[in-house]
From Swiss-Prot:
Phylogenetic classification of the source organism: Bacteria, Bacillati, Cyanobacteriota, Cyanophyceae, Synechococcales
Coiled coil: none
Taxonomic source organism: Synechococcus elongatus (strain ATCC 33912 / PCC 7942 / FACHB-805) (Anacystis nidulans R2)
Record membrane topology: Multi-pass membrane protein
Name of the protein: Photosystem I reaction center subunit XI
SUPFAM superfamilies the UniProt entry points to: Photosystem I reaction center subunit XI, PsaL (SSF81568)
Transmembrane segment boundaries: 77-97, 128-148
Pfam families for the chain: PsaL
Keywords in alphabetical order: Membrane, Photosynthesis, Photosystem I, Thylakoid, Transmembrane, Transmembrane helix
A GO CC term assigned to this protein in UniProt: plasma membrane-derived thylakoid membrane
Length: 166
């Protein structure tokens, strides 16, 4: 007897299909543990966690791979570039939340059966955006501080040497 690999996960017309990847327990647990879908978080806290991750992770590529990578100001340039991008992302989030009637309501899918409804209102999105900029700037400054400590500085020099052109 043949077994279907892809099952209908709701409305097939919009592509909500249950595949072995998106309906596996591992994938569902992983996706639902992310701050955007985790239960019990306020919109501001969601933005704070997501912004912190973005600010922290964007600092490294800007400081190590940026145009000033082989200078003494590589760390400062990376910090300023990260702050600039976080501000641009915050403006984009704010524009998205204020355009039209606000962010569209999240629909339940196979992977995320209970999306947070309070986030997808104008007020919730505004709180998310304010948390995002605070977390993003905090993450960037923390990464800058961490990369300038004497314990991490040798690792920064190794990483900069890997991607430098001599």
């Amino acid at each position: 007897m043949a077994q279907d690999v892809i099952a209908n996960g709701g409305t097939p017309e919009i592509g909500n299909l249950a595949t072995p990847i998106n309906s596996s327990p591992f994938t569902r647990t992983f996706i639902n543990a992310l701050p955007i879908y985790r239960r019990g978080l306020s919109s501001n806290r969601r933005g704070l966690e997501i912004g912190m991750a973005h600010g922290f992770l964007l600092y490294g590529p800007f400081s190590i791979l940026g145009p000033l990578r082989n200078t003494e100001t590589a760390g400062s340039a990376g910090l300023l570039a990260t702050v600039g991008l976080v501000v641009i992302l915050t403006v984009c989030l704010s524009l998205y939340g204020n355009a039209g009637s606000g962010p569209s309501a999240a629909e339940s899918t196979v992977t995320t059966p209970n999306p947070p409804q309070e986030l997808f209102t104008k007020e919730g999105w505004s709180e998310f955006t304010s948390g995002f900029i605070l977390g993003g700037l905090g993450g960037a400054f923390f990464a800058f501080y961490l990369a300038s400590t004497p314990y991490v500085q040798p690792l920064v020099k190794i990483a900069a040497g890997v991607w430098s052109v001599h």
